Curated annotation (Swiss-Prot):
PROSITE patterns: AMP_BINDING (PS00455). Residues 338-402 are annotated as: SBD2. InterPro entries: AMP-bd_C (IPR025110), AMP-bd_C_sf (IPR045851), AMP-binding_CS (IPR020845), AMP-dep_synth/lig_dom (IPR000873), ANL_N_sf (IPR042099). This is Probable CoA ligase CCL10. ATP binds at residues 196-204, 337-342, 423, 435-438, 529. It is an enzyme of class 6 (ligase).
Amino acid sequence: MEKCFNPETQIYSSHRPPVNFPTDPKLSLTSFLFRSSASYPNRTALIDADSGQTLTFLKLKTQVSKLAHSLVQLNIKKNDVVLIFAPNSIHFPVCFFSIAALGAITTTCNPSYTFTELSNQAKDCNPTLVITVPELWEKARKLNLPAIILPSPSNSKLSSKSEFWFFSDLTRKSDRFSELPISDVRQSDVAALLYSSGTTGKSKGVVLSHKNFITTSLMVTSDQDRYGDPQNICMCFLPMFHIFGLSVIAYSQLRRGNGVVSMGKFELEGALRAVEMYRVTHLFVVPPVMIALAKESVVVRRYDLSSVKEILSGAAPLGKNVMEQCARNVPGAAIIQGYGMTETCGIISIEDSKKGCRFSGSTGMLAPGIESQIMDTKRWNPLPPNQEGEIWLRGPNMMQGYLNNLEATKSTIDEQGWVKTGDIGYFDEEGQLFVVDRLKELIKCYGFQVAPAELEALLLSHPEILDAVVIPFPDEKAGEVPIANVVRSPNSSLSEEDVQRFIEKQVAPFKKLRRVTFVSSVLKSPAGKILRRELIQKVRSKI
C-alpha cells in the first residue's frame, strides 16, 4: 500500500508504471493520433458493422485530411464550434479528428434528443456548423445552420433554408489534400464540449482540451503497452457522442493502432454476429449489455466468441452474480470494471485484466498519472484506506471547467486542481478503488445520465402540478429508471398516463418517467430542500 498511498499527504496514486506524456505544447490530438500510423498504413483502423465499409489507417488519415481541408474552405476556423448530431459510424471519428486538426471544437448531441433539447445545447455553445444524417435532418435543419450530411446523397430529398454539403463529396478531393492542413493548435486548446449534468442540475458543457484526450489515450492503453500486447480489435456500440465511446474507445484505441468496429445502435444478436465476423478481442459495455450477455445464455452461446479476451463494463457498478454468469457464457474473456466521467475525459480507474477476474466490485487501480483523495463529507479532511468519503481526483486528463458556468466550475474544481466527483467510495489496502454511492443526484439509465432537476422543472411547468420530485428506481435491464412523486392542484384530474405523456413529448426516450405516484406533499427539510436520499430509501424499502 505504501506505493499508492502517502500517509503524509493522504494522497493515493497508481500502482501502474508511470507513462511519459508528450511535453510538446504545439500538438493536436489529431497529429498525435497519426504519429505512429505510418508504420502500419495498411492495417485496418475502422470497420462499419452496419455497412461493411472499412478504412485502413492510411485511408483514415487521407479522409481526415481531405475533410479538414474542406472545412477550411467552408470557413471553419480555430475555436469555431461544430455540432455532430449523428449515431455511430466510421464517419463520426473522421469528423471529430478533422475538426480537431484545425483547432475547431467538437460538441456532440444524443440522436434521440428532441429538438428542444438539441436547441438548448446549441444556444449554450453556439455552433457554426452541424454534421448530421438524413434520418435526423428534420430536427437538425431547424437550427438554421450550414450542414454536412453523412455519408452521401440519399434518395430522400432534404429541404433547407441553409446550405448543406455531403460528406462523401467533401472527402473526394484531390490527393494533394491528403496531408493535414498546417494549423496552430496547442495541447492546451479546447478540443471538445461534451455535455454532462456534473454533480447535479442541468446539463453543462464540459470543456476538454487536446491534452485531455492525448493523456487519456495513453492512460487507457497503458496496460496494453506494459504487457506488449499486439493489435486489439475493439467493438464500439456505445455511443460516440458520449465520452466513453469518443475518448476511451474511438480515439484511444485508434491512437494505439487498434482496430475499432463501429455499430450504429446496440442489438444483441447483431453485436454478437459482428464479434464473430470481425474476431473482436475487446468489448466495452454498460451494465444493461453485461446483463444481456449474462442472462441470454442460449443466444450468446450460438456465436463463436472465442476471440474475446476482455469485457470491460463502466457507467455503474455490476453485481457479482452477473459478472460470474457472463464469464461462464464467454469463458475466454476477463470480465472487468472501470470508472470514468465526462469531467475526466472518460478514465479514472480500471481493473488489470491480466490479473484475472476478481468479481470483487472494484473499479480497479487508478490509471497512471491520476491522483486521488477520499474526503470525509462532514469534516472535509482526507481519509486513509478502507474509509468511505467523496472521491476527489487530479491529473492531466481533468477538464478545464464548465462552459459559461463559473459557479459550477468553482464548486467542482478547487484551488489545488482537485475535481470533486460527487461519488462516494474508498480504496482498499491494495489500492483498488470501490465506488459505493453517489452524492450527486444523477440517475443512470441504460448508462445515460438523467438529471432529476431537468425532469422536475418540466413537471413544474404543467399548470396542474404544484410540486414534484424525481428519483431513481432499480431496474434489472436499465440499472435505474426515473420515477416521480407528484403533487396535483386541488381540482386536477391528471392521471399517471397524462403526466407520462406530458414528459415523453419533451425528452429523449431514456428520460421518460416509468412511474408516477400522486402524493399530498414532497418530503423536504425545514429549509425547503428535497430530502431525496431519504425518499429513495423509503421507496426501496418497499421493494
